[in-house]
């Protein structure tokens, strides 16, 4: 029973493989490839810039820079007192 079911499936797969790529799946020409790479790089740059801008805004809104500055000031003053 398994052999009877697997033979038609094998025939369909073999027919699809031998048929070759569809016209939409054919290899694109060089100019369209270069254009798509340019578009992808531009989009990547925008995405990175947006994420960086968001991260900087979050850091500015947090109190982390102030706490860090205060901690360094305290440590510097402690070192000055020791010397």
UniProtKB/Swiss-Prot annotation:
Keyword Iron included in the entry's annotation: no
Gene Ontology terms for molecular function: fatty acid binding; phospholipase inhibitor activity
Gene Ontology terms: biological process: lipid transport; lipoprotein metabolic process; negative regulation of cholesterol transport; negative regulation of lipid catabolic process; negative regulation of very-low-density lipoprotein particle clearance; triglyceride metabolic process; very-low-density lipoprotein particle clearance
Signal sequence interval, chain numbering: 1-26
Keyword field contains rRNA-binding: no
Keyword annotations of the record: Lipid transport, Secreted, Signal, Transport, VLDL
Gene Ontology cellular component terms for the protein in this record: high-density lipoprotein particle; very-low-density lipoprotein particle
A Pfam family per the record: ApoC-I
Subcellular location: Secreted
Chief location bin: secreted
InterPro entries: ApoC-1_sf (IPR043081), ApoC-I (IPR006781)
Family: Belongs to the apolipoprotein C1 family.
Function summary: Inhibitor of lipoprotein binding to the low density lipoprotein (LDL) receptor, LDL receptor-related protein, and very low density lipoprotein (VLDL) receptor. Associates with high density lipoproteins (HDL) and the triacylglycerol-rich lipoproteins in the plasma and makes up about 10% of the protein of the VLDL and 2% of that of HDL. Appears to interfere directly with fatty acid uptake and is also the major plasma inhibitor of cholesteryl ester transfer protein (CETP). Binds free fatty acids and reduces their intracellular esterification.
Protein name, per record: Apolipoprotein C-I
UniProt organism field: Rousettus leschenaultii (Leschenault's rousette)
């Amino acid at each position: 029973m398994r052999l009877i079911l697997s033979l038609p499936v094998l025939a369909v797969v073999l027919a699809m493989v031998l048929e070759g790529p569809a016209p939409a799946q054919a290899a694109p020409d060089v100019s369209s490839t270069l254009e798509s790479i340019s578009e992808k790089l531009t989009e990547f740059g925008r995405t990175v810039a947006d994420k960086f801008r968001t991260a900087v805004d979050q850091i500015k809104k947090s109190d982390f820079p102030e706490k860090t500055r205060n901690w360094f000031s305290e440590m510097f003053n402690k070192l000055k007192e020791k010397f």
